[in-house]
Amino acid sequence: MARSRSIKLIKWLLQLAALLTIGAAAALAYLWLQQEDWLPEPSKPFAAALGQPQPLPASDYRIDLLAADDLAFRLQKAVIEARPGTLIVLPEGRFEFNDELIINQPNITLAGQGMFKTTLDFTNQASGAQGILGLGDALRIQDLAVVNAPGDGIKTEGINHLLIQRTRVAWENGPSPLNGAYGLYPVQSKNIVIEDSHVSGASDAGIYVGQSSNIVVRRNTVEYNVAGIEIENSIFADVYDNWAAYNTAGILVFDLPNLPVYGGRNTRVFNNVVFDNSTKNFAPEGNIVGIVPSGTGLMVMANDEIEIFGNLVRNHGTASLVVVSYLVTEIPVTDANYEPYPESLWVHHNRFENPDRWYLDGSDFNLLPNLLFDMDPPEIIVDGITKTYHTQAEADAGQSCFAHNTNANQGPIRVGSMNLASGNTNLLGLPSGPALYNEPQYDCQGKSSPEIAIDTWPNAVQTQANNQQLELCKTTMDGINWQAIEADCPNLEDYGLTASLGYTYDLQTPLFSDYMEKQRTIYLPANSSLAYTASGPLKAPIGTIISKTFVNPSSQKAVETRLLIHRQSGWVGLPYLWNNGIAKLHVGGALIPQSINLEGKRIDWHYQVPNQNQCDSCHKQGKQFQPIGLATKWLNHSNQLQQLEDKGWLTELPEDPNQRPLVAAWDDTNNNNLPQRARAYLDINCGHCHNPAGLAHTSGLALKAELPMSTKTGVCKPPVAAGRGAGDLSYAIVPGEAESSILHLRMGSLDPAIKMPELSKGLVHQQGLALIKQWINQMPGTCEQL
């Protein structure tokens, strides 16, 4: 980062020289220039009435919730119990939430009374990284507001068909690096429509669509975010008729490396009003959007086949449009399949209107073009790392076309190249161009992307009502009630589970759960068995039940029991809460006051019992729910595998023990292989999400123990969509520097916007944190060598 340090030095020298040589009069003149009037605010590109509530959509089932203090709990319970095709209607009012709302069922509609009438307030949220998390296909959210979420406002992941309309997401304290990262955040989803919505205060992007396809973003108001709208690593998007004003930057189209989905292309940005995006960048350090200077209208980074037309882009002091390679970030590219250069842009028939005045915001990227263009940057700036735009009517493949764009005086705009490919530098090591201009307007013709066609909304698949299944819970027989496995029984005792009828086991390295002791038991139907697998969970027959009871180690009282039941339709998780010796189904989750004595010290906290939908957050691999601990590598200790085989409960076990996968015990201090212990700990605690099929795979960080160490496993990996979770740090793991590593930071935090794991973490595992710290500090190499 020598160039960044040089830029900071030249900024300081220039400011000092201005004060010493020009004096107070020049300083006053500079302040006057900064304050002078801009061009007037234009009209919005849509009618205000579009944001008003509309008639509710047709639905197969409807749940109307009444206003009360416990609405958050009743809403989560309603979402869990809803059948596909259900409309859930929220009342007018402001309601507090201390946990995220997860929607797993497909074909659910969540509707309020209006974006300024129904408000879900997440100011005091203690668990979960977003306000609302949508994981079910065909999700519709409308006519409500989500405010003050510590992480993202509304996030969806891996779903097909999303409609968000007339929805408001806001951080009510105004622009701040302490705000959540994204307002509306679909990722790895398709057939997305976001319309007539408002987002303000996001510390990354107001509307952010990542790693997705078939996207329409229209008629939205995005103000006072870092980026108003960002389309990242996505294909086939239409962004039009939006009002993007008073952000740091209006609209971004980016493509980044080291992600599961890359190669962004075919985005159309048209008929938007992009106005006065001059708010100082307030993104937490370490996030890629933090490099974007204020005074930026539009920016394209490393994306291909982008068409930008019909936009009014007014009052931007840095540039109306910036087109750059990812290389300008100075972050090393370690992804061999990633193409860092933008190609084949067609920018035409836009109005780029900027006043003739200086604009300095104090950022590195704002200073550089001012130096190269003698304090008079053109409307369009390209980095010049490659020959990116036409200089004649006939163009080479991959070049971009800038044609028929006008400035504030209805004249032709200027296109300027910073000519970074020249390699020329000045005495301070800064790029010195020389800057190049492409003044003439060639009548070039670019490639137009197709209009986005959203697929037909799917019909809901009908399911059996739960009250019909509850009859299965009633039995007078002794032993396990096998007929009840298809029902969510209200009482744990309805299943007839006793430890003597199953096999009790432990894991080589267990997942940390606030120091709770765990009692694990597996039950198999008669004449059935598990089948060995070298990777992933053992193959379990239909009817398998896994019971895990969490016990306070000090009081020795059971707090909760979680069941995993393998039904005909797949695995399902059920949480049961203990009270006075009876365990009852509690699908909505709970916070339970607990106390333990740890190393002679009393610790008090609220233990989180997850709601039923939160089971999916850890156990879902793609669309398939799976057990985590029921895998050979975790069971392979204390002769457990052999005992299961001898019992007739495990088949296909390799005779040679050396052929059975084995991981280290994280707390085995007699094992001198520190990396094995640390990576086993990360695998069981983080790897169920951080793997190519887990919920966190969109981050590009994989933490399975068997993977070779690389950027993908965190070494010198920049954060993606981390928000405050980046902690002003640059990489997940910095060899030799645990305190500079995002991984260590997040493990040691209880802040819901930062902590990892996100769920069921009320205490920091100090012993596990110390293990990871020791491992990172002994790791060879540096990130600078990249």
Q: Where are the predicted features?
A:
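Right-handed parallel beta-helix/beta-spiral solenoid domain characteristic of secreted/periplasmic
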Residues: 64-73, 107-150, 173
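N-terminal Sec-pathway targeting helices
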Residues: 2-22
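Extracellular beta-strand/beta-solenoid scaffold signature
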Residues: 75, 98, 122-133, 148-155, ...
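Right-handed parallel beta-helix
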Residues: 113-116, 137-148, 160-173, 190-205, ...
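Sequence context surrounding c-type heme c attachment/ligation sites in exported
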Residues: 466-474, 480, 537, 555-786
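Extracellular beta-rich repeat passengers
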Residues: 166, 241, 256, 271, ...
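Acidic Gly/Asp/Thr-rich repetitive segments characteristic of extracellular carbohydrate-active
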Residues: 60-89
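Short, T/G/N/S-enriched strand-turn elements that build extracellular solenoid repeat scaffolds
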Residues: 75-81, 96-105, 110, 121, ...
